[in-house]
């Protein structure tokens, strides 16, 4: 076998075919070790993230002013729980930035969205204009956070399960459809209250479905990385 070094890059082999088996094995072992280390980090934090979705869903129900009045203790507790969980969600995303940098952006924007949401509740804004001024940035921050979170999940899965990786990108598209639908539904109120109510109901169900699918994906993802590590 003609084993020669690359003339332009001394100390490296011209191509993989010319690399001695012992070096190939060393490279494979190094890559596998790195993947296991990444899987260990991801498995740990994604598992915590999975369990955090459950209190988040409970908080979403308890903080629904249509089910419980704004003055009720249940609503206040649900609102506080929602804010705390929102901040924790962002904090938990941050440690995974060592594997994928997009997790850092997702974490920061998740925290900012939760803090703005908290401000909206604390100030008790009644003016529709002020609700729009504070609520719109909160919505935008939340969308950016979800974009980077879902794309981070897709990125880290690419080396482990490409099909699963694509599912996160598809879920992001459906998430955008649901958000757009909710916005349109609120505008339809100006035309038909009944139609708006039906649309809001449909997209609320869609939101629940997205949350369930996300929960399922997080569980499978955490399980995959924990087993790999």
Each language-model region and where it sits:
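Intrinsically disordered, low-complexity regions enriched in Ser/Pro/Gly/Gln/His and often acidic
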Residues: 5-7, 38-40, 44, 161, ...
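Hydrophobic alpha-helical transmembrane segments in multi-pass membrane proteins
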Residues: 39-92, 97-147, 168-219
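Membrane-helix boundary/juxtamembrane motif in polytopic membrane proteins
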Residues: 151-181, 223-229
């Amino acid at each position: 076998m003609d084993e020669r070094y690359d003339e332009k890059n001394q100390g490296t082999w011209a191509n993989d075919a010319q690399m001695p088996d012992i070096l190939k094995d060393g490279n494979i072992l190094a890559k596998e070790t790195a993947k296991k280390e990444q899987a260990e980090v991801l498995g740990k934090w994604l598992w915590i993230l999975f369990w955090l979705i459950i209190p988040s869903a409970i908080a979403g129900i308890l903080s629904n002013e249509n089910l419980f009045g704004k003055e009720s203790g249940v609503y206040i507790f649900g609102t506080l729980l929602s804010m705390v969980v929102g901040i924790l969600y962002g904090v938990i995303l941050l440690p995974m930035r060592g594997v994928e940098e997009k997790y850092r952006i997702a974490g920061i924007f998740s925290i900012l969205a939760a803090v703005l949401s908290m401000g909206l509740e604390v100030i008790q804004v009644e003016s529709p204009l002020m609700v729009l001024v504070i609520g719109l940035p909160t919505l935008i921050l939340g969308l950016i956070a979800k974009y980077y979170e879902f794309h981070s999940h897709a990125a880290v899965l690419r080396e482990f399960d490409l099909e699963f990786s694509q599912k996160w990108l598809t879920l992001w598209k459906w998430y955008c459809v649901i958000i757009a639908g909710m916005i349109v539904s609120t505008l339809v109120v100006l035309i038909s209250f009944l139609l708006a109510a039906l649309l809001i109901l449909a997209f609320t169900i869609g939101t629940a479905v997205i949350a369930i699918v996300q929960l399922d994906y997080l569980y499978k993802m955490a399980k995959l990385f924990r087993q790999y590590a």
